[in-house]
Amino acid sequence: MKFVSIKIYTAVVFFLFFNVFQMCAQTFVSNKTKEDDLYAGIDVGSKGVKLSIIQMGKNASVTGSFIALKYKSVNNDFIYFTPSTFAATVKGMSSLYKFAISDFKIAPEKIFTVISSGIKGQAERENKMDHIKALMDSFKLSIQDPERNVPVIDAMGEARLSHLGIVPEARRYNTFLIDIGSGNTKGGYFKNGNTKELKLFMLNWGTKTIANATEKRMDEDKTLPNYKKQLNRVLAGDPDKEIVYAVNESGAYNMNDNFAFSGGIAWAVATMLYPELSENSVVPLNFDDLNKFNDRLASNYASLTPELISKSVIDKTLNKAEIALEIGRVQKVFDQRALMAGTSLLLNIVRQFEGTQEKKHFFLVKNGQVGWISAYVSQSVNNMY
């Protein structure tokens, strides 16, 4: 893959934006830790269960600062609401809970467990809220803690927490954050310098729900060309209508200069599309690059192996083996069709913000998966004191 050079004006904006992110407390660092300062957040999402280990910063009860030390996930596709995915999710939740206790010596009362808005939305659409209640009960039984609180968060709450957990304070009021999850997409921006007043951006579509809708349309023809055709049809239907409405209703175009995208697909695209920025947790996104990458996923996926992408890296100071390893991780989480679904959704959203009169700046946040759950833990800890 030939690395696409970043234009000078984009590089300057990226440098400023990226440096603020790097100085932000919510980044991964190697640090001496005290067990008393450690907390854990377990997030049950559409695709799997995720664990974030958080170290609260100095004066955290006042500032809310934190450091995300460890991230671990287990994929189990709870969103299918089948007996097998149900059992796998309970097992995943329990194993991550026990991992936090055994490996990090975190007390049970410092472990917070939350059901994400993507699960909630899909369960409501399929009339499967009883599955969520059963999941909570089974998890409590598994860890022998019948009184544990396992709240179900809504899209507004998750979007607000994502912004607080991902976007540094210096960019908080001119950045529109969009988190593309497995089950839905949510985000927004804070109005009038008030972190309690989020202008919500919400879609009932995420990487997994787009892929599922595409699979349902394929009938007997399971070929890749048919998948691509049906994917385009899915995106041209309700998702496109929701995107256009959500963008126009948000008023974000005139109110924000920076548009940051987080979620698993943001990490995947950033890792595969910009391998020379492998050491950066935030990378700039060029619309034309994204469009070409989206086409390549369907037409020439064989050229996107970890080995071939890493070999294309020109900078000799970078570790190509590590780059290939990270791309391999991406492709274990997202197969070709999942990448096509998620990237196409990302492309359709970016297209709506790609203006002709006023140039906007787009960014991909790689470690955004710890964002909202980290902010939830931080907020919960603050409320304890």
How would you name each of these model-derived features?
Residues 107-111, 174, 258:
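Residues at the starts of beta-strands that form the adenosine-phosphate
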Residues 81-94, 121-131, 140-173, 199, ...:
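Helical "lid/coupling" subdomains associated with nucleotide-phosphate turnover
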Residues 40-41, 71, 112-116, 151-153, ...:
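Extended hydrophobic secondary-structure segments that form protein cores and membrane-embedded regions
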Residues 47-84, 193-228:
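Short glycine-rich, Thr/Ser-proximal phosphate-binding strand/loop in the N-terminal lobe
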Residues 26-38, 49-50, 56-117, 133, ...:
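N-terminal glycine/serine-rich phosphate-binding loop of ATP-dependent small-molecule kinases
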Residues 30-63, 166-199, 203, 264:
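Gly/Thr-rich phosphate-binding beta-strand-loop-beta motif of the actin/hexokinase/Hsp70
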Residues 25, 56, 127-130, 190-193, ...:
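Short, glycine/charged-enriched secondary-structure capping and boundary segments
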Residues 1-28:
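Bacterial Sec-dependent N-terminal signal peptides
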